[in-house]
């Protein structure tokens, strides 16, 4: 396997959040010291909590952390799927509708100069008779080289229960099969020899 130049101490440059509490979609540049200020209720606490969720994913207890917050129904963005121009001008209230056209998803990401990571969570079983239908599940994860995402930059990806190392020309190598929907790739693939990128980013 060719050496992809995994860094010793990747610096983080951006935090991205979508669908979490009051944060419909936000990308925040990060520096050596990032100061966030604003009026009460503008989302500062939710921004801090979202960063804590990414840390929980690295520790392997993200789903438990979400459950402690009240589960996905308590943390999902409750506003509209689309923000209209009238809403942005203050001419129309910003509120959710009774029906959703798209599956509810919580997306979190952290970007670095050399390594970046994103995770997508959603509800569990589609069987609405199941007692676990509202349980949070990890749907997808991505780990890529560099900051801005590009498919060619993917190093490791998770789709459902499968974690793969991404190879040239779409030739992917399975790293873990039958991964629990409550387990992130950081704990499913923990061997630094199999996936040094995962091991290194987890330490960041």
In which residue ranges do the predicted regions lie?
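Conserved lysine of the Walker
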Residues: 44
């Amino acid at each position: 396997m060719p050496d992809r130049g995994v860094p010793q101490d990747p610096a983080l440059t951006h935090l991205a959040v979508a669908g979490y509490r009051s944060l419909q979609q936000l990308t925040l540049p990060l520096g050596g010291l990032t100061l966030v200020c604003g009026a009460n209720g503008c989302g500062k606490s939710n921004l801090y909590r979202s960063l804590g969720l990414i840390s929980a994913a690295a520790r392997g207890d993200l789903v438990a952390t979400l459950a402690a917050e009240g589960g996905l129904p308590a943390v999902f963005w409750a506003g509209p799927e689309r923000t209209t121009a009238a809403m942005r001008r203050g001419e129309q209230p910003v509120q959710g509708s009774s029906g959703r056209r798209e599956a509810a998803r919580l997306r979190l990401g952290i970007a670095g100069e050399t390594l970046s990571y994103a995770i997508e969570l959603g509800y569990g079983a589609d069987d609405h008779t199941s007692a676990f239908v509202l349980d949070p599940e990890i749907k997808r994860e991505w780990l890529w080289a560099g900051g801005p995402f590009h498919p060619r930059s993917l190093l490791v990806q998770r789709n459902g229960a499968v974690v793969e190392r991404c190879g040239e020309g779409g030739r992917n190598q399975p790293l873990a099969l039958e991964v629990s929907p409550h387990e992130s790739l950081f704990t499913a693939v923990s061997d630094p020899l199999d996936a040094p990128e995962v091991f290194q980013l987890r330490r960041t």
